[in-house]
């Protein structure tokens, strides 16, 4: 059965894989794993998550601060990672479309056009500030990492 988190759905086969990994780390068969096992569990899923992100997610699903999470909490964390990875793929696809010269960078004027089209009613000054914060070297171009940080507010 698929599992839905906000607007993201974890497919049935992904839930099964997650369940298998969860069981491996549920050493006592208590239907819970230690929050310290999240990192190794994600590595077992061939996923990389920064330790501070794992801690943040663990804190969100370990409501009573026991240091343990159940399978539902694990699935929520897994879903967040899958969503994060999908968002990055989508941004890479968008970046490739905007990278007209296929040089791994987009012109800040193209970025300005994108920001105007986001529908956030940004002023020219706000857009200028965002571009200045993104194009830190003043080259007039933005690479994918800079684009990603801007679009995800990281």
Swiss-Prot record:
Main location: membrane
Residues involved in Ca(2+) 1 binding: 62, 64, 66
Binding site for Ca(2+) 3: 135, 137, 139, 146
GO cellular component: a single term: myosin II complex
Keywords (A to Z) from UniProt: Calcium, Membrane, Metal-binding, Repeat
Ranges where the EF-hand domain occurs: 13-48, 49-84, 86-121, 122-154
Residues that hold Ca(2+) 2 according to the record: 99, 101, 105, 110
A molecular function (GO) term: calcium ion binding
Domain of life per record: Eukaryota
Matching InterPro entries: CALM/Myosin/TropC-like (IPR050230), EF-hand-dom_pair (IPR011992), EF_Hand_1_Ca_BS (IPR018247), EF_hand_dom (IPR002048)
Role, per record: Calcium-binding protein.
Protein name as it appears in the record: 20 kDa calcium-binding protein
Organism: Schistosoma mansoni
Name of the gene: SM20
């Amino acid at each position: 059965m698929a599992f839905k988190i906000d607007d993201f759905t974890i497919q049935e086969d992904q839930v099964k894989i997650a369940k298998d990994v969860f069981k491996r780390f549920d050493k006592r068969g208590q239907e819970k794993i230690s929050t310290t096992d999240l990192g190794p569990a994600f590595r077992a899923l061939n996923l990389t998550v920064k330790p501070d992100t794992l801690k943040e997610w663990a804190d969100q699903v370990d409501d009573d601060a026991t240091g343990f999470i159940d399978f539902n909490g694990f699935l929520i964390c897994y879903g967040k990672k899958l969503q994060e990875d999908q968002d990055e793929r989508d941004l890479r696809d968008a970046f490739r479309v905007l990278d007209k010269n296929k040089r791994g960078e987009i012109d800040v004027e193209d970025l300005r056009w994108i920001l105007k089209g986001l529908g956030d009613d940004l002023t020219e000054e706000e857009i200028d500030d965002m571009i200045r914060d993104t194009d830190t070297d003043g080259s007039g171009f933005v690479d994918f990492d800079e684009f990603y940080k801007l679009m995800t507010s990281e």
